[in-house]
Structure formats: C-alpha cells, structure tokens
C-alpha cells in the first residue's frame, strides 16, 4: 500500500489501538524515510504524518537519516503535527533512545563510537557456528554464468529490466510450476536484488 491507502490503513490502526485497545501512546516503527526520491509518490514518513493523527513517535528507517536531517525537513522539534520523528542514521553509528516521562516524549541518538560491550562467549560461539554453515553453503558451486548478471541499483534493477532480474523471475516460475499449477509470470522486487554476479 502507498499514498492515500497507506494513510488510511495507518489511521485505522491508530484508532483501533487507542479506542479499542486503550493504548496511551502509539509508537510507530516504519521504513519510509524522508528522502526526495520517495517524495514523488508521497510515501515518506513526513507525508504519512501530515495525514495521520494520533501517533506519538515515528521511528523511521530507509533513508538512514540523522535527527539533524529530519529537523531540516520538519522543524527544530522534528515534529509533524504532534508526532516526533526520529532515526538513528546508518550502520549502527547511533543507538536511538525514546523516553516517555510525565507525558513528555524525548528522543536522542547516542553515538556508538567508543562504547565497548564485552563479548558473550555463548552467543559468539553460536554466531561462529552459523557463519561456518553459511560459508560452507556459499562455497558450493551450483551454477556458472558466461555473462555478468547486473545487480546494480540504477541504471539497473530499480529502473529497468535486467538479466539478473530475468534470471530470478525465471527461477521463481520454474519452482512454482513444480506445484502442478499453471504459472504465467513472476515478479520480484528490484530493491531485493543487491549485488552484481560476475561472469564465472
């Protein structure tokens, strides 16, 4: 869903949470972002919040924005209507903190640089075991390609048909036909194709 349909779904959910569930606060975790790229379709968090009331805090993603960048698109309080918008930037540079005290909501981003957390040996061992399984699986050659398969964003899978997108959807059709049903077509999200596969 997007645009007006998305706004209505969000508003219905907020109404249900407040009126039927009796929630005092509604905190929305979303992946809409504030970048100009999505402004064309009016699918940014700030577009949604201009149409939806009753959300106290919107914890955003997608555009990897900092609170300073959000303030540039909104105001010094990072508010759209009564909703505070927050986001932690990118690559775990910050840890987001939302505090609700005496009906006052504040948000902040705590930089992770310099924070040291002691390793948990049990978790480290489990993570290493999973990584070994993945590496073993990735090491198996199951196919070869004579051409480079385009996994680029633009120009590429987000802007046009590509050979890697074709391969993926052909594979989806092939697998789906194993159900015995007639399959006419398959569609894949260009945003889910993340890397080029070199010839070889």
Q: Positions of the model-derived regions?
A:
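Binuclear metal-dependent hydrolase catalytic cores centered on His/Asp/Glu-rich metal-binding motifs
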Residues: 1-25, 106-108
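Glycine-enriched alpha-helix->loop->beta-strand junction motifs that scaffold or abut catalytic
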Residues: 53-55, 81-82
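Solvent-exposed loop/linker segments at secondary-structure transitions
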Residues: 18, 25, 36-50, 57, ...
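Peri-catalytic substrate-binding/gating loops that frame the active-site cleft of hydrolases
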Residues: 1-9, 33-42, 66-67
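Residue-level detector of flexible, active-site-proximal loop/helix-junction positions
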Residues: 65, 92, 194
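Phosphate/diphosphate-binding loops
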Residues: 85-94, 100
């Amino acid at each position: 869903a997007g645009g007006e349909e998305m706004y209505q779904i969000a508003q219905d959910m907020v109404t249900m949470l407040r009126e039927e569930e009796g929630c005092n606060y509604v905190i929305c975790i979303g992946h809409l972002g504030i970048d100009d790229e999505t402004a064309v379709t009016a699918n940014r968090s700030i577009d949604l919040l201009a149409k939806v009331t009753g959300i106290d805090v919107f914890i955003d993603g997608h555009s990897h924005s900092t609170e300073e960048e959000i303030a540039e698109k909104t105001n010094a309080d990072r508010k759209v209507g009564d909703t505070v918008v927050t986001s932690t930037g990118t690559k775990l540079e910050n840890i987001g903190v939302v505090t609700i005290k005496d009906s006052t909501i504040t948000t902040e981003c705590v930089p992770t640089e310099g924070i040291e957390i002691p390793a948990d040996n049990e978790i480290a061992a489990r993570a290493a075991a999973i990584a070994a399984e993945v590496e073993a699986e990735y090491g198996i050659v199951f196919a070869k390609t004579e051409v480079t398969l385009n996994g680029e964003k633009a120009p590429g899978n987000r802007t046009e048909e590509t050979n890697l997108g074709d391969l993926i959807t052909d594979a989806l059709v092939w697998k789906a036909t194993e159900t015995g049903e007639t399959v006419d077509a398959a569609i894949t999200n260009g945003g889910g194709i993340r890397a080029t596969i070199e010839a070889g």
